[in-house]
């Protein structure tokens, strides 16, 4: 199953980028043995439209154009539902074992996501109700992908609840 992360905006050099690249490298090292690909990162430019609804629509169209047919889609949104790491691992395994060709995780722009992107999602996911900086969300998404892989591989990184 192909793994992809689509994010609006670029991560500048700094600690968030270093952490994101570190977790991505760790995930990539485990992926093949689990029937998964390395994580493909697509950074989309932020819209320069003047009005927020226009920016959301423009960025949404660019996001939708990046979603492969048949791919499972997780959209990061503060209004989404919280899922445990073990629950996320179960869902990823179910998509993989069910023959889904890919999994794409989407991080929208500063103005959020348009409804058409949310509608395309198989899972609207949140790390909580708080609004988080996009760079930090990217780090957390890649850490969770790595954690999912360690759970699927039986690696001791994820200790979970006793």
Swiss-Prot record:
Transmembrane segments: none annotated. The keyword Transferase applies. Its EC number is 2.1.1.177. Its main location: cytoplasm. It is an enzyme of class 2 (transferase). It is found in: Cytoplasm. Keywords: Cytoplasm, Methyltransferase, rRNA processing, S-adenosyl-L-methionine, Transferase. It comes from the Bacteria. GO terms for cellular component: cytoplasm. It catalyses: pseudouridine(1915) in 23S rRNA + S-adenosyl-L-methionine = N(3)-methylpseudouridine(1915) in 23S rRNA + S-adenosyl-L-homocysteine + H(+). InterPro entries: Alpha/beta_knot_MTases (IPR029028), RlmH-like (IPR003742), tRNA_m1G_MTases_N (IPR029026). GO terms for molecular function: rRNA (pseudouridine-N3-)-methyltransferase activity. S-adenosyl-L-methionine binds at residue 108. Specifically methylates the pseudouridine at position 1915 (m3Psi1915) in 23S rRNA. Homodimer. Belongs to the RNA methyltransferase RlmH family. This is Ribosomal RNA large subunit methyltransferase H. It comes from Methylobacterium sp. (strain 4-46). The gene is rlmH.
């Amino acid at each position: 199953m192909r793994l992809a992360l689509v994010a609006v905006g670029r991560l500048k050099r700094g600690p968030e980028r270093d952490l994101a690249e570190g977790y991505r490298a760790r995930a990539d090292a485990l992926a093949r043995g689990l029937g998964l690909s390395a994580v493909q990162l697509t950074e989309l430019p932020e819209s320069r439209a003047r009005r927020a609804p226009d920016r959301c629509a423009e960025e949404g169209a660019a996001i939708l154009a990046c979603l492969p047919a048949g791919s499972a889609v997780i959209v990061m949104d503060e209004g989404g539902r919280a899922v445990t790491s073990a629950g996320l691992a179960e869902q990823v395994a179910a998509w993989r074992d069910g023959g889904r060709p890919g999994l794409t995780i989407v991080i929208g722009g500063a103005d959020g996501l348009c409804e058409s992107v949310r509608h395309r999602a198989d899972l609207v996911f949140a790390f909580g109700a708080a609004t988080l900086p996009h760079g930090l969300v990217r780090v957390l998404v890649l850490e969770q992908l790595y954690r999912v892989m360690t759970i699927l591989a039986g690696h001791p990184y994820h200790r979970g609840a006793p």
